[in-house]
Structures are given as C-alpha cells and as structure tokens.
C-alpha cells in the first residue's frame, strides 16, 4: 500500500466517518490510523482475517463513492492550494512593501 493511498484514505475516513457503521469505523481506524495488520484486527474482533479484509475493501469502495458524489476531499485540497497561493501572494506583497519602504527611507 502506498503512502499516497494511505493518506487519501485517512482523509476520506475523516470526512465521511459519520456515514460508516461503527464496525467499519473501527476496522478502518485500526487499519489506516493505528497501522494494525489484518491479523491483529481479526484477533481483536474474533473474526477471520478474510472478513476484515473484505470489510475494509468494501468500506474503501464506499468512501470513494461518497467522495465521487460529495467531493469533500477534492474541495478541501482546492482550498488548501488556494490558501497556499494566497500566502505566497501576501508574502510577495510584504516583500514589495518592505522594499518600497526601504526606498522611501533612502531619499
């Protein structure tokens, strides 16, 4: 599993956890947030490893479907990019203001 997928799933869990059942929330939290193995989760809940795997895969699919329809994560990423752009613009503005002040003080 790639770090990118793990990060994406962590965000999707954060955004859509209210739409999951308690069991789905538990499995996903343990697997993605707490880095439990399938075997450890299976042991904790006294179910088969395959049952945990199937539940996690179904839940991943559900989370992706929620994201397709609601786009909360996509909008979050867009807001973050716009915020970074705004911060850069403000920094540039501050730099320009400081330079103008320095020039004014030279006269």
From Swiss-Prot:
InterPro entries (UniProt xref): RNA_pol_sigma_r3/r4-like (IPR013324), UPF0122 (IPR007394), UPF0122_fam_protein (IPR054831), WH-like_DNA-bd_sf (IPR036388)
Alphabetical list of SUPFAM superfamilies matching this protein: Sigma3 and sigma4 domains of RNA polymerase sigma factors
Pfam families: UPF0122
Cysteine-cysteine disulfides: none
UniProt xrefs under Gene3D superfamilies: Winged helix-like DNA-binding domain superfamily/Winged helix DNA-binding domain
The protein's role, per its UniProt record: Might take part in the signal recognition particle (SRP) pathway. This is inferred from the conservation of its genetic proximity to ftsY/ffh. May be a regulatory protein.
Stored HAMAP family: UPF0122
Protein family according to the UniProt entry: Belongs to the UPF0122 family.
Name of this protein: UPF0122 protein EAT1b_2891
Species: Exiguobacterium sp. (strain ATCC BAA-1283 / AT1b)
């Amino acid at each position: 599993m790639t770090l990118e997928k793990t990060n994406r799933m962590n965000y999707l869990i954060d955004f859509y956890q209210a739409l999951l059942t308690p069991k789905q929330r538990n499995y996903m939290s343990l697997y993605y947030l707490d880095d439990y193995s399938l075997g450890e989760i299976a042991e904790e809940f006294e179910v088969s490893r395959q049952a945990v795997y199937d539940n996690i895969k179904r839940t991943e699919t559900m989370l992706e479907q929620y994201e397709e329809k609601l786009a909360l994560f996509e909008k979050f990423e867009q807001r973050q990019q716009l915020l970074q752009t705004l911060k850069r613009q403000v920094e540039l503005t501050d730099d320009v203001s400081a330079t103008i002040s320095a020039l004014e003080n030279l006269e």
